[in-house]
């Protein structure tokens, strides 16, 4: 069975993430959305909140599983017995970092391939960082995220 890992912080999960996951779900038998407990970032939402939102947003996809993880992505990939990682590239500026990361990952676990997908045109400009900033400043981020996520962003802003 072909299993792919789609890692990210998903803080929050956006329509762009959904687009890539939906497309990956057509290419692979199983997609594991790996929500990182990234210690290098200060997320707006807790790991548990991010996992819960992603599960709710992606519930319609029978071959998509959402799980949180901490530590090295390659160790998680090994534990999942997966051999492919999918990453999204929105712009050329994403490529250099992702290319370096893919090379480092390959040096740690040579059996794992990294595949890059570009988002559909209408999602190329969406980033979770920008979505959070729009919401934080009182703007309407609802067209960039699932309604559940938009509601959670609104609730965060009120606090």
Swiss-Prot record:
Origin: domain of life: Bacteria
Residues flagged as site, Transition state stabilizer: 17
Keyword Isomerase: no
Residues binding ATP: 9-10, 17, 88-90, 98, 123-129
Catalyzed reactions per annotation: (R)-4'-phosphopantetheine + ATP + H(+) = 3'-dephospho-CoA + diphosphate
ATP-binding in keyword set: yes
Example GO molecular function: ATP binding
First-listed, main subcellular location of the protein, grouped into a coarse class: cytoplasm
Gene Ontology CC terms: cytoplasm
Pathway: Cofactor biosynthesis; coenzyme A biosynthesis; CoA from (R)-pantothenate: step 4/5
Binding site for substrate: 9, 41, 73, 87
Signal peptide: none
Xref: InterPro entries: Cyt_trans-like, PPAT, Rossmann-like_a/b/a_fold
Localization per Swiss-Prot or TrEMBL: Cytoplasm
Assigned keywords, A-Z: ATP-binding, Coenzyme A biosynthesis, Cytoplasm, Magnesium, Nucleotide-binding, Nucleotidyltransferase, Transferase
GO biological process: coenzyme A biosynthetic process
EC annotation from Swiss-Prot or TrEMBL: 2.7.7.3
Cofactor(s) listed in the protein's UniProt record: Mg(2+)
Function field: Reversibly transfers an adenylyl group from ATP to 4'-phosphopantetheine, yielding dephospho-CoA (dPCoA) and pyrophosphate.
Family: Belongs to the bacterial CoaD family.
Quaternary structure note: Homohexamer.
Protein name: Phosphopantetheine adenylyltransferase
Organism ancestry: Bacteria, Pseudomonadati, Pseudomonadota, Betaproteobacteria, Nitrosomonadales
């Amino acid at each position: 069975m072909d299993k792919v890992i789609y890692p990210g912080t998903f803080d929050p999960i956006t329509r762009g993430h959904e687009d890539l996951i939906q497309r990956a779900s057509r290419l692979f038998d199983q997609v594991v959305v790996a929500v990182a407990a990234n210690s290098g970032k200060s997320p707006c939402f807790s790991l548990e909140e991010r996992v819960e939102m992603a599960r709710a947003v992606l519930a319609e996809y029978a071959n998509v599983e959402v799980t949180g993880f901490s530590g090295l992505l390659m160790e998680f990939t090994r534990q999942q017995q997966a051999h492919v990682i999918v990453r999204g590239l929105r712009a050329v500026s994403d490529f250099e970092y992702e290319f370096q990361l893919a090379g480092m990952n390959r040096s740690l676990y040579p059996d794992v391939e990294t595949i890059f997908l570009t988002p559909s045109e209408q999602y190329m400009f969406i980033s979770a960082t920008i979505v959070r900033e729009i919401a934080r400043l009182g703007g309407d981020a609802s067209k960039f995220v699932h309604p559940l996520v938009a509601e959670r962003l609104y609730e965060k802003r009120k606090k």
